[in-house]
A protein has these predicted regions:
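N-terminal catalytic or cofactor-binding beta/alpha core of small enzyme domains
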Residues: 1-66, 125
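Haloarchaeal acidic low-complexity proteome signature biased toward cell-envelope/secretome components but also
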Residues: 3, 10, 15-17, 161-203
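Short beta-strand segments
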Residues: 41-42, 72-75, 134
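Internal, conserved structured core segments that host functional sites
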Residues: 46-96
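Catalytic cores of large soluble enzymes that bind and process phosphate-bearing ligands
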Residues: 47, 51, 111, 142, ...
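General structural feature for long, well-ordered alpha-helical segments within catalytic domains
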Residues: 51, 55, 59, 115, ...
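Secondary-structure boundary elements
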Residues: 60-69, 125-129, 156-163
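Catalytic cores of processing enzymes, dominated by hydrolases/peptidases
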Residues: 80-156
Length: 203
């Protein structure tokens, strides 16, 4: 259920409307499940780099006020198509909560950028407990396998909930087939593109 709206400085002043309703709402909202004691931050717009710092400071202050444990999520490019690794990072004293999870420590030095990076940075600077999860995913297509791995190995155990991920497997097959069709069309288009090439001498 809708719990609160974010009116942080730097966010675009736009109105979001939905199907089957006449009302509008702000683009960045917080939804709550009181029974499970869960909060979800949803944004219908991209947060621009110029607004990320202001937004992160605004939201992090609210996290501290309500004593929430934020879970930040970002993606990194898959190393192969066979595995989906999930890596964990933490701020404050939350690192110990990663020990019992099926997530790896990052195998190399890296940077979390964008709005998620700004949120993690603000949590660290304010000594706020938070967990960050970096999941291997496709940079070009929706990746249900990555979503499934993230939910089952990170979100479910931390939040103590169960999520039905069967639909994600079905979507993974659909997306895989769509990717193959797209690759075939791209190859066919490439074969037909304009080009110049030598054909040998003739008289």
């Amino acid at each position: 259920a809708h719990y609160a709206s974010c009116h942080c400085k730097g966010l675009p002043e736009v109105a979001v409307y939905d199907a089957d309703g006449h009302g509008v709402e702000p683009p960045v909202r917080i939804h709550a499940d009181e029974r499970r004691n869960l909060l979800v931050l949803q944004s219908d717009i991209p947060i621009s780099p110029s607004a990320a710092e202001e937004f992160a400071g605004c939201v992090t202050g609210w996290f501290a006020e309500v004593d929430a444990l934020p879970l930040f999520v970002t993606g990194t490019q898959r190393r192969d198509q066979e595995t989906t690794d999930v890596f964990g990072i933490a701020t404050g004293d939350a690192g110990s909560r990663l020990d019992d999870l099926d997530v790896k420590t990052p195998g190399e030095r890296g940077v979390v950028s964008g709005p998620t990076g700004a949120l993690v940075y603000q949590a660290s600077m304010n000594d706020l407990d938070s967990l960050g999860f970096i999941v291997e995913a496709s940079p070009q297509f929706p990746d249900p396998a990555a979503a499934k791995a993230l939910l089952e190995r990170a979100v479910e155990p931390v939040a103590d909930i169960e999520v039905d991920t069967d639909a994600l497997i079905e979507r993974a097959q659909e997306i895989s087939e769509a990717k193959e069709k797209l690759a075939k069309r791209m190859q066919e288009a490439g074969d037909e593109r304009s080009q110049a090439q030598p054909v040998g001498m003739f008289q």
